[in-house]
Amino acid sequence: CSGCDRKAQVNAEPESSEKIEYAVTETEEVFTETKKLVIEDLDDAYEALLDSCSKEFIGDYRIDESFLNWVYANYGKEAVLNIAQESQEDQNVNVWYEETGNSIHVLWLLYCQDTGMNEEDLQQVYWKTCSSEDEIVLDFTGDINFAEGWGTTEHMDGQPNGINDCFSKDLLQEMNHADIMMINNEFTYSTRGEPLAGKDYTFRADPKRVALLETFGTDIVSLANNHVYDYGEAALIDTIDTLEEAGIPYVGAGKDLKDAMRPVYFVANGKKIAIVSATQIERSLNYTKEATETTPGVLKTLNPDKFLKVIEEARDNSDYVIAFVHWGTEGNNYFGSDQVALAKQFVEAGVDVIIGGHTHCLQGMEYMDGVPIIYSLGNFWFSASTLDTGLSQVIIRDDGTIDFRFLPCIQKNYKTSLVTDERSEEHTSE
């Protein structure tokens, strides 16, 4: 449609007697004059939108006539007229979603798909079909470990139904029902490398274990943690290759800094969601290497400058930004002032939700300037200990609002279960 003749399209429309007024503000030095103009047809609507875009990007995209032709061809005249009206009055980017069922970010991706233009904008974008047209449900877990020789893995291998016996049925149903499911991949997939000298705990899983992620309905993993580099550079590269071969996106680490800084985007129900990840750990040690322009590693945020750039990029290119952060002090149920200070910077940079991990125990939750933060989800399936854990659930409603929930779970005897009234009573009595 990019080569369509707009004049031919306009002339093909029947004459319309409707007149839509919109306001244009013109500023010259020290005075402002507001004029009431009239949109009678597509020419007027195009002129209004293109004039607006010459002054300010719409949704950070330089909207041109080719794009407007595409919108007209796919959504009709009335949508273009209404978008022109609303956009001129208050630069309301939500009107694109209201009129087409897709945000300006999603429209741009669809336009690029149809025309073959700006193909780089389609990288790291995954399209999801949701269970409901009214909401997008995202679930997040804490630490999971499939490492060879580790207690969780040995227990799993001894069960008749393998990993299915390590989680309650209702919990697995919940995880698979989520539209987007994310876990913290707290180990490396490889058969290569040696454990880092001097490190107390090192975790490496056979690459075939990646198939276990299907049990959870996993859509994305975080590699921004202090165990993904436990067996060195080669094992990290194997981890990335293993995930790519399995078709599972990752964030927070990469084969170089550009890869480690790259957000992952999901498109669902006409909205575009960015997920970004980084690790504050290790704070005083350097076992886990930071990615550079030429070497693999994780994205670190002890100094948050790089991660703030990632958040800002994601903010410019999506409707929502969710940050998954590895931080805090192991074994401490109380979040620290350093976590709060980082969270404040992330919120100012534009995140909508912050999910934390690393401490192997739950930490508190709060809202900061309207942004929900769970400081640590702790272990999800990591040890034999009896621990409180849970799923963090983010629900994006059709009206654009975000609901934030915590679904409590218990990790006990190598099995993680949703807390029901019956299980809660049993756990409390013990």
Task: Name each model feature, range by range.
Residues R6-L42, Q124-V137, T153-C166:
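N-terminal, intrinsically disordered, polar/charged segments of Gram-positive cell-envelope systems
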Residues A45-T115:
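Active-site-proximal alpha-helical
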Residues L110-T129:
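Short, low-complexity, Pro/Ser/Thr/Gly-rich segments in the mature regions of secreted, periplasmic
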Residues S2-G3:
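C-terminal motif of bacterial Sec signal peptides marking the signal peptidase cleavage site
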Residues E40, D44-E47, R209, A234:
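Active-site-adjacent structural elements in enzyme catalytic domains
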